[in-house]
Design a protein with these regions (language model features):
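Bacterial N-terminal signal peptides
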Residues: 6-14
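Boundary at the C-terminal end of the N-terminal hydrophobic targeting segment
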Residues: 17-19
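Aromatic (Trp/Tyr) and acidic
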Residues: 21-56, 69-78, 121-122, 128-206, ...
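Low-complexity, Pro/Ser/Thr- and charge-rich linker/hinge segments at domain boundaries
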Residues: 107-129, 210-248
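Acidic, glycine-anchored loop motifs typical of Ca2+
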Residues: 328-342
Length: 689
């Protein structure tokens, strides 16, 4: 589950360990702190005993202080911090502990220093500003400032052996100050002069070195590929098999049969008797670690379509190894249908709602079951799924999405375009009718989406008048763009609801309306740019934003900035996007990459049913899952120090364990949707077939 870079960090160790506790690595946490990393097959955060500091000796002398941190992981990770006199390059150290004796020669070019936080996967070459952070944290010893002169640093290119090679650049770390969001005393390492390529490593004088990292090139290409394909892996109603996956873990189509129960909307409480009428439906996505399909998921195809409109040159067919040729039952026949993969993915996310639509145009809110599917591949699904209630919000959103897809797909398939356009009007009329019956108006969000897309496709004058008259409504995006994505199912604004109008030819648009939409987008961008500057780490999350996954939702937060960069070409916009997207890949207080299978400090146990199966098979978790990450104050999961709402900074409130859905689950619409398009844009498209 975890990569140990012994070749790169060149530790010389003699190891003895108990049957339960296994010694893994010597690290540093400061220029006078040696860190010992143990893993245990027992989930006991008090297993490592430091109550007698005299038993922890370095070169025969008791450590000046002994601190620790422990947390549930796989099964338990334990980090012991030994404060010693200032470390000296070339000096040999013998460490005696109650759990064994270890020897190493300190070399700051070889030993890993956990205080250095980098993007462990790929910094974007499009950005002119890149950085790493540095912060000392000693578990129950708390955070620590650097005393005395600030150290220098050097960036080296690594040789194939993992040893440092050519010097790339150097400088001195810069003090940022104490950060409220993380609790850290933060220092900055400027990487702006590091050119495209890699692998590189940062060496901080007297402290140690970072994890390796790359800039652009194949590193960004791999990130783009893995991130985009997270959507494919989350598809419902399809096999996930070789050669379209590194391993075949779902050999049967799943969740095709839906029982028409029309039950109330609720989490895991829908009882299916098995005698109800059924329909067959393919497409859409599993919600998260479970398999329900929900209205919120329409933000995925909406975002994919907008991204293709804005950056068509970056997306092609046969780009992401996604099957796109099927028989009538959606058995895979091959790929290469001549349609860009991003539009194939958009169709998969859209077509479920086509199959789910009633004859009168209404659409149920989604599918649900009673309880949860077992933690294994959906080949072994043992739950029946039924439809939730018919909901006008669903048909309202679908009316805009159907027209959006119909317009974009028309050059590739006119018949399919016509079908979706007809369904769009059917959905819109059903929604208006149902809202009227309930003495309510259709939300402005969906009204705008429908009217913009229908006007751009058909030239309908009445739709255009609506768009012009209500353009100011879009300013509400400023207050909703960074909220929990459930709000997009009614009052929350997506850029997709109006951005197509901005991109349309001037001959088809009204200048005042375009300006109103651009003003709304600009105000949103300005707000997020300010939020980016609030915290020392590039998470861009205001302190009052606290929904599940909000601290790793940089894709959602940066998407309006990406679109403004498209319109203006301003370098400052892509710089901020790039820096914020570094956060989830390791440039965070925990130094953890929250996207599965990438980076060096990886997520052990995503709360994901099919990953439980792939891990059991020895393949590791399914690739590209961006878990919720830190920020939710979990209960009843072992950790030391105990995670507390009153004392633990939000960016350190994280435990990596399967059952911890607050930290280690994810959703298709919150976690995977936006990064799946932002990372390919930062890579300049994906071309490394």
């Amino acid at each position: 589950m975890r990569t140990i870079l012994t070749a790169i960090f060149g530790l010389f160790l003699t190891i003895s360990a108990s049957a339960k506790l296994t010694f893994r690595e010597i690290r540093t946490a400061a220029d006078n702190v040696i860190e010992l990393f143990y893993v245990s097959d027992t989930l006991d955060v008090n297993e490592v005993d430091i109550s007698d500091p005299a038993q922890w000796k370095v070169n025969g002398q008791p450590a000046l202080a002994v601190n620790r941190i422990a947390a549930a992981a796989d099964q338990c990770d334990n980090f012991i911090y030994l404060t010693v006199p200032t470390l000296e390059n070339g000096k040999k150290y013998t460490i005696d502990t109650p759990y064994g004796s270890y020897k190493f020669k300190f070399n700051d070019k070889e030993v890993f220093c956990e205080a250095i936080k980098t993007n462990q996967v790929a910094y974007s070459a499009l950005s002119t500003k890149r950085f790493a952070n540095m912060a000392i944290y000693l578990g129950d010893g708390g955070t620590r400032k650097i005393e005395g002169a600030l150290p220098g640093y050097t960036v080296y290119k690594l040789k194939k052996s993992g040893k440092v090679g050519k010097k790339i650049c150097s400088g001195q770390v810069k003090e940022i100050g104490q950060d409220r969001s993380s609790g850290d005393f933060v220092y900055r390492i400027d990487l702006s002069q590091v050119p495209e390529g890699g692998l590189y490593k940062i060496v901080v004088d007297g402290y140690g070195s970072s994890y390796p990292f790359g800039v652009g090139s194949d590193f960004s290409q791999k990130l783009a590929y893995v991130s985009f394909r997270s959507l494919f892996n989350q598809r419902c109603g399809i096999q996930i098999i070789e050669p379209y996956s590194d391993f075949s873990y779902r050999t049967k189509r799943c969740h095709e049969t839906i029982y028409q129960t029309y039950d109330r909307i609720g989490e895991a409480r829908l009882v299916v008797k098995g005698t109800e009428p059924t329909i067959q439906a393919w497409g859409g996505y599993h919600d998260a670690g479970d398999a329900d399909r929900r209205t919120y998921h329409m933000d995925v195809p909406s975002t994919l379509l907008t991204t293709y409109e804005a950056f068509p040159e970056l997306f092609t067919d046969n780009q992401f190894n996604i099957p796109d040729i099927f028989d009538e039952q959606f058995n895979i026949l091959g790929k290469g249908n001549g349609i860009p993969d991003i539009l194939d993915e958009a169709e998969w996310g859209t077509m479920f709602w086509k199959y789910f639509q009633e004859e009168d145009g209404q659409i149920p809110w989604g599918t649900e079951t009673n309880g949860y599917s077992p933690f294994t591949t959906y080949d072994f699904e043992d739950h029946l799924f039924g439809s939730e209630t018919l909901d006008p919000r669903t048909s309202a959103w679908a009316s805009g999405l159907f027209y959006h897809f119909a317009r974009i797909i028309k050059p590739f398939d006119e018949a399919k375009s016509a079908e979706y356009a007809a369904r769009a009007d059917l959905a819109y009329n059903a929604s208006v009718r149902t809202y009227a019956e309930r003495n309510r108006e259709m939300p402005a969000t969906f009204c705008m989406y429908y009217n913009v897309e229908k006007y751009l496709m058909t030239g309908d004058a009445e739709c255009h008048e609506y768009v012009k008259a209500h353009a100011a409504d879009a300013m509400q995006i400023v207050d909703t763009y960074n909220q929990g994505s459930e709000i997009f199912a009614e009052r929350g604004w997506l850029t997709s609801y109006f951005f197509s109008y901005i991109l349309a030819p001037e001959s088809k648009t009204d200048a005042a309306t375009v300006k109103a939409f651009k003003d709304a987008l600009q105000a949103t961008v300005d707000k997020q740019m300010a939020a980016f500057l609030e915290n020392a780490y590039p998470n861009g999350t205001p302190m009052n934003v606290t929904w599940w996954g909000s601290n790793v939702a940089q894709g959602q937060y940066t998407y309006p900035i990406v679109l403004m960069w498209k319109l203006t070409g301003k370098q400052e916009y892509i710089d901020v996007v790039s820096q914020m997207m570094d956060y989830a890949l390791g440039l965070n207080p925990l130094g953890k990459c929250f996207m599965t299978t990438l980076g060096y400090n990886q997520v052990h146990w995503p709360h994901d049913r099919e990953s439980a199966y792939t891990i059991e098979q020895g393949w590791g978790p399914r690739p590209g899952i961006l878990v919720f990450g830190p920020g939710n104050y979990v209960r009843n999961y072992p950790s030391y120090p105990v995670i507390s709402r009153n004392s633990t900074p939000r960016e350190r409130a994280y435990i990596d364990i399967l059952d911890n859905y607050q930290n280690n689950e994810y959703t298709i619409y919150q976690s995977l949707c936006f990064p799946s398009v932002v990372y390919p844009i930062l890579a300049g498209g994906y071309t490394s077939h």
